[in-house]
C-alpha cells in the first residue's frame, strides 16, 4: 500500500518545487519552509510579535527509514497587515498554508469578481485519483490531530494508516463524526467572506451522510430549519449529506438558499417578487411547481439524491418564520407590504475537506440587518424599493445632491432592525457585526498567525469608513477545509428521464418573458373559468384599502379577483361586472373620500344599466357622525336603483366599536352567499383563512401571565403600539377661556417641548395626545379582577401557539403592570361590542346575568342598551356583579385606547418652544340625565394635569388644511366654538410673517359663533387685537343664546352679511374658505353656501354641486370636521352638546 509517512512531516512534499517569488511587503525571496509537526500544538504562546515560531518535533514509533529524517527550522516570512485607524500592525504567516492560487493576474486584480474560478468547484465525471486524494487526506488528518491540546500520537498514526489503507482499497475514505464536525467548523473559520466567524466554534452539525433518497433529504432539511429557526432565537447549523464519489451520484440542493422568495416575469415585462430568482423560479415551474404570483412566495426545495433527477418539495408554511416590516416612526411603512424570512441558509456550496467533496451541505447563521435592508430591499436587481421610500419620506428624489438615497436606506435599515427586534427574531446590526469581526481577527492572529479575509465582502454596504473593518488591511487566501461555490446544477445535470428535462434555455430576457407569458396564460385560463369579482375601494387613511385587499384575498379562494381604487375605475365598466364588492369610508359631512369623487359623480349620473350584476357594500365610519357610513349606503342605493342585485346586506364598521370584527363577519357572510349564488364548485370544502374565522369564545387555557423584569418606557411602548413617533411635552399652564357665568369649561392649554425645540408643525395641523383613564375607573376594575397581580408587578401576556405546543409572547402590549395597561393602553370607557359581551358571558356565575349578556348579543337588544347607557367597562361589571373576569382577558380582549386629536392653536414661528391647544372639557349624564356622570377621557385627563406633568403626544399632518401658499390670497375662516382652534394658529402665523418677514397677507375674515358674549366668546380680546393690527380684516360673531333675541348661527351670518364677500373671495379672487367644527355645522354651512352661490351665479343644482366639487379639487374649500357626540340618553341641554367627538 502507499506509505503515508512521507506526508507526515512535509505535507506539501508531493507538490512540485516551489517557485521563488518576492514578498510584497518585505521584498525578500520566499523559500520552501518546514511545517509544524502534528504532535506540536500551534500554541499562541509560541508567537512573538504576531508571528508564530516554527517548531520541529520527532514522532515516536515511526518506520526505521524515517529515523534519519531531519527537518530544519526556519523562521517563516510574513506579510505586514496594518489598521489605518489605530495604526496597529499584524504579521500574517498563516497564508503559507494556503492550498490554491487566486486567479488574479500580474496586470489585473479580480478581487471584485462575484464567483472567481479559484473559489468555484465544478462537477466530476470520475473519482478523485489516489495520488491526488491521499496527500490531502493525510494533511487533514494531521490538521485534525494537531488541534488537540494533548498529542494523541498512537491514535494519530493508527488513523493515518487506516485512512491510507481505506483509500488504497476503496479509492476513497470516510470521515469520522468528530472529524466531520471539526471540518465543518474549520471551513467556517476559514471562510474569508463571512463577517460573523467569531461564532465558528458554535456550529451545530447534523450528519445526514446515510441519506439515500430525495425524500430523506427533505426530512433532514425540515429538521434543520426547525432547529435553526428556534422560534426566532436563530441557531447556526449545518446538515452534511453524502460525499461525492465518482461525480455521477452527487447529492445536490438546487436552491441557492433553503428559504427564498420567487421572482416572476409578468406578461407586461414587470417583475413581481425577487428578481434575483427569476431563472430558478421558472425552473421550479417547469418541474411542476404551481406558482402563486405573489411578491413573497416561498420557493420549493429542489433536491437531487444519488445523481437522480431532482424532485420538488413544498416547504411546510409553519416552518418558515417571516418578519413583517414596520417602522418605529413612519406608520405608512407597513403599507409597503414588506416582509422577509428569518433564516438565512446557504444551500448550494460545496465543502472540501481532506480531498473529499460534499456538494450538499446547507448551513445557516443569522442575518446582519444590511443584508435585508440594503441588498435585498434596495438593490435595483432585487426588490428596488429605495425610490418609493424616498418619495414617501418627502425627499428630493430628483436630485442626487439631496442625499435622499442615504437618508432613505438608513430608514429602511431602521425598519428591518426594529421589525426583527419587535418580533424577537435574531438579527445583528452592521456596526456590531464589524466590531465582532475585528475581535475575531485579533483572536485569530494570536492563535493562528493570520485570518483570511476578503475586504470587499466584509465592509458593510452602508456606513463604510465609520465601521472599523473599512480601515483594516486584509489578506485573502484559501485554506482547507473550505466552502466553495458550485456551478448551477441544472447547467450540468445529466437527465435520466427526458420528460422531466426543462426546455433548454439561456437566461435571455426575451425567452424568459415568453415562458412566463405562457405560464401566465395557463393561469389566466384557470382564472377565466371562475366568476370575476372586482373589489372597489375608496379611502382617506388607507384603512379601506387594507380591508379591500383582505377581502380580495378571501374571495380569491373561489373567484377571479382584482382590487381597484375608485379613482382608477370607470362607471362604464359596470356593464362588464359579474360580482362587485365595495369597501369605502365616509369622509367629512357624509362625503366620499377624495379618491372616490370622480366615480361618485359619474356613477350618480347613470340612469340605467343594460347588464345587471351582483354586489355587496361595506362601509367604514364613526358612529359619532350623524352621516354614519353615508357614502356606503349611497352606493348601495344607487346600484340597487340601477338594477343590480344585492348579494348581502350592507355592512357597517364602526371605528368606535369593533370595526374589524364587523368586517370579518360581513366578509365571511358575503363570501358564503357568493359561493351559493354562483354555485362555486367544491364550495363546501373551501378552507377560509383563520383570520376571518377567529373563535367567538375566549379560552383561558390559551393565555397566561408571567412576571417580567422589564420596566415600562411609556413613550416607547406607545410608539410601538400605535406606530407613531411619540415624544413628551410638559404642561406649562392652562386657562379657562369661558367666564365664571358659564357652566362649561374650555381650556387654553400651553405645552412646552422638552429641550430647546420639538418636532416641527404647521398651522392647521393636529396634536395627537395619549391620555390616561381616570384612576377611579381603573381601581374599580382592578377590584373586580379574579386573579389580579400585585398593583405594581410588571407582567407579560403569553399565548399558546396554534399547535398548542409552546408559549409565545403576545405582541399587542408591552410588559407592564395591569394598572398601567388599564390606565394608558386599554380603552375602558367605550361600550363593549356584542362579541365582547358574548365572551364575557362565560365568566358570569349567575344564570340570570349570563342569559342577559347572551340576550344583549342580539342587535336590537344591544343597540337599545348601548345608546341608553353608553356604559364603561366598570359599569358593565357593576351591572352584572357575578362576572369574575381574569386579568388575561382584559389584556387580550379590551380594545386599545386611541389617541385624541386637537387642532393646534399656535404658530411655531410665533411660539417656537410651545404648542397651544383649545380643549373643551366634556361631561354628561346618560339615561336622560338620570344616569351616572361620564367624563371625556382626554379633556378630563388634561384638566387634572399639574404644571410640568408629562404629556405623551405626536404631530399629525393635515395637508388639506393649511394657509394658502400665496399669502396674498383672501380667506374666509368659519369656526364656531372650539372650531376656532386652528384659526388662532392662522392669525398668529400671519402676525409673525407681517412683523418679522414684512409679508402683507390678503384679507382674512373670521366668522365665529358661540352662545353668549359674556360667557363663551373664546379669544374675544385676541380677535379684537388682530383686527387692530390688521391681521384679521373683519370678525363676525353669531350668538345663539342672547335673551329675547333670535338664535344666530355662522351660516346665518354668511347668508345675511357676507354673501357678496363669499362670492368675491371664491369666484372673483380665487381665494380660500376654511370650515372647522362639528359635522352638523359644516353640513349647514355647505348647504347655505351652495344656495348662495347658486342664486348669485344662477346655477342649477347639478351645476352648483360641480362648482363646489371643483373648489375642493383646487384645494380652495377646506374642511376640518369632527363628529358630534350624540347623547346616549343624555339630557337635552347638558354639557354634552359641545360637539367634540374624537377630542373627548
Curated annotation (Swiss-Prot):
Q: Give start and end of each FAD-binding FR-type domain.
A: 724-964
Tissue specificity: Macrophages.
**BP GO terms, sorted:** arginine catabolic process; cellular response to cytokine stimulus; cellular response to lipopolysaccharide; cellular response to type II interferon; cellular response to xenobiotic stimulus; circadian rhythm; defense response to bacterium; Fc-gamma receptor signaling pathway involved in phagocytosis
Q: Which residues bind (6R)-L-erythro-5,6,7,8-tetrahydrobiopterin?
A: 112, 375, 456-457, 470
Chain ranges passing through the membrane: none
Pfam families named among the record's database cross-references? FAD_binding_1 (PF00667), Flavodoxin_1 (PF00258), NAD_binding_1 (PF00175), NO_synthase (PF02898)
Regulation of activity: Not stimulated by calcium/calmodulin. Aspirin inhibits expression and function of this enzyme and effects may be exerted at the level of translational/post-translational modification and directly on the catalytic activity.
Task: Cite the effect that the entry attributes to residue 968 to F.
Answer: In strain: BALB/CBYJ
- For this entry, the protein name equals Nitric oxide synthase, inducible
Amino acid at each position: 500500500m502507499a506509505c503515508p509517512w512521507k506526508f507526515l512531516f512535509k505535507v506539501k512534499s508531493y507538490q512540485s518545487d516551489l517557485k521563488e517569488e518576492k514578498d510584497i511587503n518585505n521584498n525578500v525571496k520566499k523559500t520552501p519552509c518546514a511545517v509544524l509537526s502534528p504532535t506540536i500544538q500551534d500554541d499562541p504562546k509560541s508567537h512573538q510579535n504576531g508571528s508564530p515560531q516554527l517548531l520541529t518535533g520527532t514522532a515516536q514509533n515511526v518506520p526505521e527509514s524515517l529515523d534519519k529524517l531531519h527537518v530544519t527550522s526556519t523562521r517563516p516570512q510574513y506579510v505586514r497587515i496594518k489598521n489605518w485607524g489605530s495604526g496597529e500592525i499584524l504579521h500574517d504567516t498563516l497564508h503559507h498554508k494556503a492550498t490554491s492560487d487566486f486567479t488574479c493576474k500580474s496586470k489585473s486584480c479580480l478581487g471584485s469578481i462575484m464567483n472567481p474560478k479559484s473559489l468555484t468547484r465544478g462537477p466530476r465525471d470520475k473519482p478523485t485519483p489516489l495520488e491526488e486524494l491521499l496527500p490531502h487526506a493525510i494533511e487533514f488528518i494531521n490538521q485534525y490531530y494537531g488541534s488537540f491540546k494533548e498529542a494523541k500520537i498512537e491514535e494519530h498514526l493508527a488513523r493515518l494508516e487506516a485512512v491510507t489503507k481505506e483509500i488504497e482499497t476503496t479509492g476513497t475514505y470516510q470521515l469520522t463524526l468528530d472529524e466531520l464536525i471539526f471540518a465543518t467548523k474549520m471551513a467556517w473559520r476559514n471562510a474569508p467572506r463571512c463577517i460573523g466567524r467569531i461564532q465558528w466554534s458554535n456550529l451545530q452539525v447534523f450528519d445526514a451522510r446515510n441519506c439515500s433518497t430525495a425524500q430523506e433529504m427533505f426530512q433532514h432539511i425540515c429538521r434543520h430549519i426547525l432547529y435553526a429557526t428556534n422560534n426566532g432565537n436563530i441557531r447556526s447549523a449545518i446538515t452534511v449529506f453524502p460525499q461525492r464519489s465518482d461525480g455521477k451520484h452527487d447529492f445536490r440542493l438546487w436552491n441557492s438558499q433553503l428559504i427564498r422568495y420567487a421572482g416572476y416575469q409578468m406578461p407586461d415585462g414587470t417583475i413581481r417578487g425577487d428578481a434575483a430568482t427569476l431563472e430558478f423560479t421558472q425552473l421550479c415551474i417547469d418541474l411542476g411547481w404551481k406558482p402563486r404570483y405573489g411578491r413573497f412566495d416561498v420557493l420549493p426545495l429542489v433536491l437531487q439524491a444519488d445523481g437522480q433527477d431532482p424532485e420538488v418539495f413544498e416547504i411546510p408554511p409553519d416552518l418558515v418564520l417571516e418578519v413583517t416590516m414596520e417602522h418605529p416612526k413612519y406608520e405608512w411603512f407597513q403599507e409597503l407590504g414588506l416582509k422577509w424570512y428569518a433564516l438565512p441558509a446557504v444551500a448550494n456550496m460545496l465543502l472540501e475537506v481532506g480531498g473529499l467533496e460534499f456538494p450538499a451541505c446547507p448551513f445557516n447563521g443569522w442575518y446582519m440587518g444590511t443584508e435585508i435592508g440594503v441588498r435585498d430591499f434596495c438593490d435595483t436587481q432585487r426588490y428596488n424599493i429605495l425610490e418609493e421610500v424616498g418619495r414617501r419620506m418627502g425627499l428630493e428624489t430628483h436630485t442626487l445632491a439631496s442625499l435622499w438615497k442615504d437618508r432613505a436606506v438608513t430608514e429602511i435599515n431602521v425598519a428591518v432592525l426594529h421589525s426583527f427586534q419587535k418580533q424577537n427574531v435574531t438579527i445583528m446590526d452592521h456596526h456590531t457585526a464589524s466590531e465582532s469581526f475585528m475581535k475575531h481577527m485579533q483572536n485569530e492572529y494570536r492563535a493562528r498567525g493570520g485570518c483570511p479575509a476578503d475586504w470587499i465582502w466584509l465592509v458593510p454596504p452602508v456606513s463604510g469608513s465609520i465601521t472599523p473593518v473599512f480601515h483594516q488591511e486584509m489578506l485573502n487566501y484559501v485554506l482547507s477545509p473550505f466552502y466553495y461555490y458550485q456551478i448551477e446544477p441544472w447547467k450540468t445535470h445529466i437527465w435520466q428521464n427526458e420528460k422531466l428535462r426543462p426546455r433548454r434555455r439561456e437566461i435571455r430576457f426575451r425567452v424568459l418573458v415568453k415562458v412566463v407569458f405562457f405560464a401566465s396564460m395557463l393561469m389566466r385560463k384557470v382564472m377565466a373559468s371562475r366568476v370575476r369579482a372586482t373589489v372597489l375601494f375608496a379611502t382617506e387613511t388607507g384603512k379601506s384599502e387594507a380591508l379591500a385587499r383582505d377581502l380580495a384575498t378571501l374571495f380569491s379562494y373561489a373567484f377571479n379577483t382584482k382590487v381597484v381604487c375608485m379613482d382608477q375605475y370607470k362607471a362604464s365598466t359596470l356593464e362588464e361586472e359579474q360580482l362587485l364588492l365595495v369597501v369605502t369610508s365616509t369622509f367629512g359631512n357624509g362625503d366620499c373620500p377624495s379618491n372616490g369623487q370622480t366615480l361618485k359623480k359619474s356613477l350618480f349620473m347613470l340612469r340605467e344599466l343594460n347588464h345587471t350584476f351582483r354586489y355587496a357594500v361595506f362601509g367604514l365610519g364613526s358612529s359619532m357622525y350623524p352621516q354614519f357610513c353615508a357614502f356606503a349606503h349611497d352606493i348601495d342605493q344607487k346600484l340597487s336603483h340601477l338594477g343590480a342585485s344585492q348579494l348581502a346586506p350592507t355592512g357597517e364598521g364602526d371605528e368606535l366599536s369593533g370595526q374589524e370584527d364587523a368586517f370579518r363577519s360581513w366578509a365571511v357572510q358575503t363570501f358564503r352567499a357568493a359561493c351559493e349564488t354562483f354555485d362555486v364548485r367544491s364550495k363546501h370544502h373551501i378552507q377560509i383563512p383563520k383570520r376571518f374565522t377567529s373563535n367567538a369564545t375566549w379560552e383561558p387555557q390559551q393565555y397566561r401571565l408571567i412576571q417580567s423584569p422589564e420596566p415600562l418606557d411609556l413613550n416607547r411602548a406607545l410608539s410601538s403600539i400605535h406606530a407613531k413617533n411619540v415624544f413628551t411635552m410638559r404642561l406649562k399652564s392652562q386657562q379657562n377661556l369661558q367666564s365664571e357665568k358659564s357652566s362649561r369649561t374650555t381650556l387654553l392649554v400651553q405645552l412646552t417641548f422638552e429641550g430647546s425645540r420639538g418636532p416641527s408643525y404647521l398651522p392647521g395641523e393636529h396634536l395627537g395626545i395619549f391620555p390616561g383613564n381616570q384612576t377611579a375607573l381603573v381601581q374599580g376594575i382592578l377590584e373586580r379582577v379574579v386573579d389580579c397581580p400585585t398593583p405594581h408587578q410588571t407582567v407579560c401576556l403569553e399565548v399558546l401557539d396554534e399547535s398548542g405546543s409552546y408559549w409565545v409572547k403576545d405582541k399587542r402590549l408591552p410588559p407592564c403592570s395591569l394598572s398601567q395597561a388599564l390606565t394608558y393602553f386599554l380603552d375602558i370607557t367605550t361600550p363593549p361590542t356584542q362579541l365582547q359581551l358574548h365572551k364575557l358571558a362565560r365568566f358570569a356565575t349567575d344564570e340570570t346575568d349570563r342569559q342577559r349578556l347572551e340576550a344583549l348579543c342580539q342587535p336590537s337588544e344591544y343597540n337599545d342598551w348601548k345608546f341608553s347607557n353608553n356604559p364603561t367597562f366598570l359599569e358593565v361589571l357593576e351591572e352584572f356583579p357575578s362576572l369574575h373576569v381574569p386579568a388575561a382577558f382584559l389584556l387580550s380582549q379590551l380594545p386599545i385606547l386611541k389617541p385624541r386629536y386637537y387642532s393646534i392653536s399656535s404658530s411655531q414661528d410665533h411660539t417656537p418652544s410651545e404648542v397651544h391647544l383649545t380643549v373643551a372639557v366634556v361631561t354628561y349624564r346618560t339615561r336622560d340625565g338620570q344616569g351616572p356622570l361620564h367624563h371625556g377621557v382626554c379633556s378630563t385627563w388634561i384638566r387634572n394635569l399639574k404644571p410640568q406633568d408629562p404629556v405623551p403626544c405626536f404631530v399629525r399632518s393635515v395637508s388639506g388644511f393649511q394657509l394658502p401658499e400665496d399669502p396674498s390670497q383672501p380667506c374666509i375662516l368659519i369656526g364656531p366654538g372650539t372650531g376656532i382652534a386652528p384659526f388662532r394658529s392662522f392669525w398668529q402665523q400671519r402676525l409673525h410673517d407681517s412683523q418679522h418677514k414684512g409679508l402683507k397677507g390678503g384679507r382674512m375674515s373670521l366668522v365665529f359663533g358661540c352662545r353668549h358674549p359674556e360667557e363663551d366668546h373664546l379669544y374675544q380680546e385676541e380677535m379684537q387685537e388682530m383686527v387692530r393690527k390688521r391681521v384679521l380684516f373683519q370678525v363676525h360673531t353669531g350668538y345663539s343664546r342672547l335673551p329675547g333675541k333670535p338664535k344666530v348661527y355662522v351660516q346665518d351670518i354668511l347668508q345675511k352679511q357676507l354673501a357678496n364677500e363669499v362670492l368675491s373671495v371664491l369666484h372673483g379672487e380665487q381665494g380660500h374658505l376654511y370650515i372647522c367644527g362639528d359635522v352638523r355645522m359644516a353640513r349647514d354651512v355647505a348647504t347655505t353656501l351652495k344656495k348662495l352661490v347658486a342664486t348669485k351665479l344662477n346655477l342649477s343644482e347639478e351645476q352648483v354641486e360641480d362648482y363646489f366639487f371643483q373648489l375642493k379639487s383646487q384645494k380652495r374649500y377646506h374642511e376640518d370636521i369632527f363628529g358630534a357626540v350624540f347623547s346616549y340618553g343624555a339630557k337635552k341641554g347638558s354639557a354634552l352638546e359641545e360637539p367634540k367627538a374624537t377630542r373627548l
